[in-house]
Amino acid sequence: MKRRRFALDIRPGAVALLAGLYFLLPLRWCVRLALAVVVHELGHVAALVLCGAEVYGLRMEACGLALRCAPPEGAVRTIAAALAGPAAGAGLFCILRGLGYPEGADLSLLYACANLLPVLPLDGGRALEAVVAALAGARAAERLLDVLGLVLPVALMGLGVALFARGMGLALGVFGAWLALLQPGMTCQGGKHDVKYSYYQM
């Protein structure tokens, strides 16, 4: 079978997102964030290749990055592919800490932990979906992730508002709103119900 050429799909929203980050963050933090994102995605790619899944491309949009690939076969491979990104981020944390770059290390760890939240289309949600589907069936997994996809973003937004009222910034609330936008039926969907491709968000 002929292999497909890797495709990079950059949406207009991605350009706006990158421009916003450039103007809102100091250049050094943009570089640190870019390093964390690249290492995270390379972790996914390495695991997918080792699991025998073909990677078709990378899509950049207003809600972040989505790695497009053939769905890995079996729960174990799906879990491994999902957790490989955060694992790579944790490895980068250790390396940067050892080299004396604590800011970049902490950002990489924060990025990895955020992706482990049990909500689709994040890595933690994909891993949880595979586990529940293997133990209780795909329908039970879908119902659980639907509930988490509603409850968790709302909880994060509520907590973010409470923290903002205490003068601690809006970051958590914005993150919760971003997660809400990634849920099916919203503006930025994570490809949850796509049967042809699997997407690894961020």
Task: Go through each PLM region and give its residues.
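Hydrophobic transmembrane alpha-helices and their immediate loop junctions
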Residues: 1-202
